[in-house]
């Protein structure tokens, strides 16, 4: 053991001693609390709340509050949290991660910090990996909270708005990370305060924290809007790409998950499409179509990265084997896969709101988590979330036996050995859990077992409906269960099946005989651990418990540990082993030459296995290499998203102010916009004789109905300030006229007993709604531009420039441009408010198309669309040399000439 490890372990020991002292304080209050009546126990909640208001802290209340929850759990559920569970609860209250092994009762652990933090009255969120677990945990632990006078809500995907609002208003809310995240995004595209559901992000406990905060960190949550149509192109490229040859027409880098066409490949594609140059400016969208079609063809495999069900493509979570409902690959990849599989293409959507899991959860005032496997990712938790990992001791000693890996030359030989092992274990009655890395492998093994006549269950993304039922029965005698990765995580596998206790089964001589054999075989197992168990449960324990068989090492050691952790719960016996082959992706891609030379030196027969420390070390090194790479990828994603996150915070804060009734200072927007216009046409740095007052009048009319008579100016003595004062005074008068007209018309409608069609009660409300629509529209366009910038920024590295620095700089410029666009759009709108419907569609139409001086003076003939929409940052087709958004794509700009129109 090196010095650093010793120091770290000493630190761990000190932490556990401090936690133990807190546990002793909780236990010291137990006799007093146990003597209270139900009513007196319930009354402690109000007492705690009063003490908080009186200046005491949650830390002051912790020993008493935890003792109260411990007693209520005993009375309502018949479960008394062990000392190690109380210890885990303290860690969660401290905003840290409690690493607790499978079967240690994490669900019960959470009740103590949840209750304590709910006393503050600001809401507590308990985050789970799926809807089933959210509902199960809320119902299971609900009696504790309800006994203590707290309300419990649960969020489910199928819930409507009113149900969600009620669930969030409760003291404690259970739900999935996706539901909490999407509700946050929906709140930030709401158009009235009545549409908000969430309260402040106060305190959250994340169950299976490694799965949610690390494994899903690379997948952003996205709410999308209406699409652009390009289905035919996806099908065309799906037909072209299979005709290309790897190595000649394109190169694939499986490690980096990248693909690149060669010059020869590009020439073939150009010929197939009948175009002279794929990289010509008007064909830039075709390059992305080619890249995504190549990725879909080479890197994404059916029944591994995705499945096809009911004519739709569903992403499969590589870590859990579950279908990621509602998630789609971005940048056209999902559509490329749909075209490859020949199913209907669902059009690309425009991003309306997006946030990464990382940045959503970093917003909580206090964040805690629990899992069975976090130690290997401790650095990442600290770096990204500032969360410390604390390993909690098990209640009973762990006696599972983890066997060395067996490595075969080929997958075929490996699977044959796996099936033989399963058959042998099944015949003696030992339950077997087989872990696979993909749906494809699980179904292949299932077919092999069927040939051998072995009854079994398959748990993968295709059979997720029966997940809890299948996993709960995986510990029955003779059961064989094949599961993709950690499908079924969160559900305990009890030896003998879900009814481990046998429903109060009376013990016989056979029970006694088995109990004696077990205690003789396993000295750490005591009689009280066996009492009350069913005969089947005792038989399974005597057979060695659950046997976990991994068919491939995962990229992350943590996922392997999770699989192993399904066995040996609460001091039960268990066994685990991984079967590998040199053809496995991990060994093939990351094992390097060492593995190849080892294989050649040993000269293995196909059906022979090696079981050597050298192989295990090579596997560990390969896993560490991948873990490091994945951490760097997540870290880089976060660095880029942090740029957008700061901008998001600004925009969402503005929206929230508008939404909550903050009065809009319209005149300040008018002053900013018109001052900018005046500085371009009548600058104080230019002689008045050189001012373009005619051009100024025309430009001002694009923003408001200008009535300034510039001919009255004495041009020789005029100043820029004088011009500014004239314009702003006129603009102020026109705004007041608009306001007066509005109020007059509204009053007239009221006199007639009518209501406004747009539902706006006052000009103030109209100002708020208009600004909100403009902010949303411009933010959507900005998200598109930032995504466009992000996709191409990597090439800056070739010019010896740091892509991240460039992204920050250009992202800031785009944000400043967006802010100016918001001001200009708002001013244009507010002066014409009586003539326009206040909808986001109209705001977008104004932003992207243009028109005359008045929005209702549009050309009567419809504008033609070419196949491709002109991007805001592309050169304007009119030939001016300016970006499109600065020229004919600008608010109020005249339409392009017919031959060039969009």
From Swiss-Prot:
Annotated residues for binding of ATP: 85, 103-107, 492
Enzyme class, first EC level, given as a word: translocase
EC number: 7.4.2.8
Record carries keyword Transport: yes
Chief subcellular location: membrane
GO terms (BP aspect): intracellular protein transmembrane transport; protein import; protein targeting; protein transport by the Sec complex
Cofactor note (record): May bind 1 zinc ion per subunit.
Catalytic reactions of this protein: ATP + H2O + cellular proteinSide 1 = ADP + phosphate + cellular proteinSide 2
Keyword list, A-Z: ATP-binding, Cell membrane, Cytoplasm, Membrane, Metal-binding, Nucleotide-binding, Protein transport, Translocase, Translocation, Transport, Zinc
Subcellular location(s) per record: Cell membrane; Cytoplasm
Cofactor: Zn(2+)
Region feature (Disordered): 846-902
Pfam families to which the protein is assigned, alphabetical: P-loop_SecA, SEC-C, SecA_DEAD, SecA_PP_bind, SecA_SW
Self-association state and partner proteins as the record states: Monomer and homodimer. Part of the essential Sec protein translocation apparatus which comprises SecA, SecYEG and auxiliary proteins SecDF. Other proteins may also be involved.
Stated role: Part of the Sec protein translocase complex. Interacts with the SecYEG preprotein conducting channel. Has a central role in coupling the hydrolysis of ATP to the transfer of proteins into and across the cell membrane, serving as an ATP-driven molecular motor driving the stepwise translocation of polypeptide chains across the membrane.
Family per similarity comment: Belongs to the SecA family.
Protein name per Swiss-Prot or TrEMBL: Protein translocase subunit SecA
Protein's gene: secA
């Amino acid at each position: 053991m090196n010095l650093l490890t010793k120091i770290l372990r000493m630190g761990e020991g000190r932490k556990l001693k401090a936690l133990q002292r807190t546990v002793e304080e909780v236990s010291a209050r137990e006799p007093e609390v146990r003597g209270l009546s139900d009513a007196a126990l319930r009354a402690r909640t109000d007492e705690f709340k009063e003490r908080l208001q009186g200046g005491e802290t949650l830390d002051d209340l912790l020993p008493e509050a935890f003792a109260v929850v411990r007693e209520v759990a005993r009375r309502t559920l018949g479960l008394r949290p062990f000392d190690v569970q109380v210890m885990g609860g303290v860690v969660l209250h401290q905003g840290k991660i409690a690493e607790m092994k499978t079967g240690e009762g994490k669900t019960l652990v959470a009740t103590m910090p949840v209750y304590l933090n709910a006393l503050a009255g600001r809401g507590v969120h308990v985050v789970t990996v799926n809807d089933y677990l959210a509902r199960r945990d809320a119902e299971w632990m609900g009696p504790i909270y309800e006994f203590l006078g707290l309300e419990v809500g649960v969020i489910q995907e199928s819930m409507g708005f009113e149900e969600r609002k009620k669930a969030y208003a409760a003291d404690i809310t259970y739900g999935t990370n996706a539901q909490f995240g999407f509700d946050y995004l929906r709140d930030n595209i709401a158009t009235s305060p009545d549409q908000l559901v969430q309260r402040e992000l106060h305190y959250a406990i994340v169950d299976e924290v490694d799965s949610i905060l690390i494994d899903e960190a690379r997948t952003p949550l996205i709410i999308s809007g209406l699409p652009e149509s390009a289905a035919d192109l996806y099908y065309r490229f799906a037909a072209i790409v299979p005709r290309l040859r790897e190595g000649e027409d394109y190169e694939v880098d499986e490690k980096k998950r990248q693909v690149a066409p060669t010059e020869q490949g590009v020439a073939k594609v150009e010929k197939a499409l009948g175009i002279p140059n794929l990289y010509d400016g008007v064909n830039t969208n075709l390059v992305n179509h080619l890249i995504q079609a190549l990725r879909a063809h080479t890197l994404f495999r059916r029944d591994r990265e995705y499945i096809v069900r009911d004519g739709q493509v569903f992403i499969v979570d590589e870590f859990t084997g579950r279908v990621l409902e509602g998630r789609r690959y971005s940048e056209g990849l999902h559509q490329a896969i749909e075209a490859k599989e020949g199913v209907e293409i669902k059009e690309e959507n425009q991003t309306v709101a997006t946030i990464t899991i990382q940045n959503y959860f970093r917003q909580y005032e206090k964040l805690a988590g629990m899992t069975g496997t976090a130690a290997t990712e401790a650095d990442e938790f600290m770096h990204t979330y500032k969360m410390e990992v604390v390993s909690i001791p098990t209640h009973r000693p762990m006696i599972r036996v983890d066997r060395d890996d067996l490595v075969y030359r080929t997958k075929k030989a490996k699977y044959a050995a796996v099936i033989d092992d399963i058959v042998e274990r099944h015949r003696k009655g030992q339950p077997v859990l087989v872990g696979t890395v993909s749906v494809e492998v699980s179904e292949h093994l299932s077919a092999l077992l069927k040939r051998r006549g072995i009854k079994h269950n398959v748990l993968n993304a295709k059979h997720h409906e029966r997940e809890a039922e299948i996993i709960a029965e995986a510990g029955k005698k003779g059961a064989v269960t094949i599961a993709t990765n950690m499908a079924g995580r969160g559900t305990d596998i009890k030896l003998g099946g879900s009814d481990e206790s046998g429903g109060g089964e009376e013990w016989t001589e056979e029970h006694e005989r088995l109990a004696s054999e077990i205690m003789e075989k396993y000295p750490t197992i005591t009689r009280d651990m066996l009492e009350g168990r069913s005969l089947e449960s005792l038989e399974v324990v005597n057979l060695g418990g659950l046997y976990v068989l991994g068919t491939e090492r995962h990229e992350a050691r943590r996922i392997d540990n999770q699989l192993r952790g399904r066995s040996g719960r609460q001091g039960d016996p268990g066994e685990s082993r991984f079967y590998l082959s040199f053809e496995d992706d991990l060994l093939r891609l990351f094992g390097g030459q060492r593995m190849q030379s080892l294989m050649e030196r040993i000269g293995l027969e196909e059906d022979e296995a090696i079981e050597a420390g050298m192989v295990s070390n090579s596997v560990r090194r390969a896993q560490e290499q991948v873990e490091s790479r994945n951490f760097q990828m997540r870290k880089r994603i976060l660095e880029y998203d942090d740029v957008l996150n700061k901008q998001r915070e600004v925009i969402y804060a503005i929206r929230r102010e508008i939404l909550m009734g903050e009065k809009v200072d319209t005149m300040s927007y008018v002053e900013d916009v018109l001052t900018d216009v005046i500085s371009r046409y009548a600058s104080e740095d230019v002689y008045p004789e050189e001012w373009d007052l005619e051009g100024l009048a025309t430009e001002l009319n694009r923003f408001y109905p200008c009535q300034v008579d510039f001919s009255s100016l004495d041009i020789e003595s005029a100043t820029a300030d004088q011009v500014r004062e004239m314009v702003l005074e006129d603009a102020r008068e026109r705004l007041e006229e608009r306001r007066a007209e509005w109020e007059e018309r509204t009053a007239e409608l009221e006199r007639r007993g009518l209501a406004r069609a747009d539902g706006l009660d006052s000009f103030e409300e109209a100002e708020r709604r208009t600004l909100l629509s403009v902010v949303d529209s411009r933010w959507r366009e900005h998200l598109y531009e930032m995504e466009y910038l992000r996709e191409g920024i990597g090439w800056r590295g070739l010019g010896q420039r740091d892509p991240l620095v460039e992204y920050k700089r250009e992202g800031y410029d785009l944000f400043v441009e967006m802010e100016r666009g918001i001001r200009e759009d708002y001013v244009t709108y507010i002066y014409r408010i009586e003539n326009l419907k206040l909808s986001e569609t109209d705001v977008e139409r104004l932003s992207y198309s243009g028109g005359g001086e008045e929005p209702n003076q549009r050309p009567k003939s419809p504008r033609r669309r070419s196949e491709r929409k002109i991007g805001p940052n592309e050169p304007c087709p009119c030939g001016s040399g300016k970006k499109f958004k600065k020229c004919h794509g600008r608010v109020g700009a005249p339409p392009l000439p017919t031959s060039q129109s969009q």
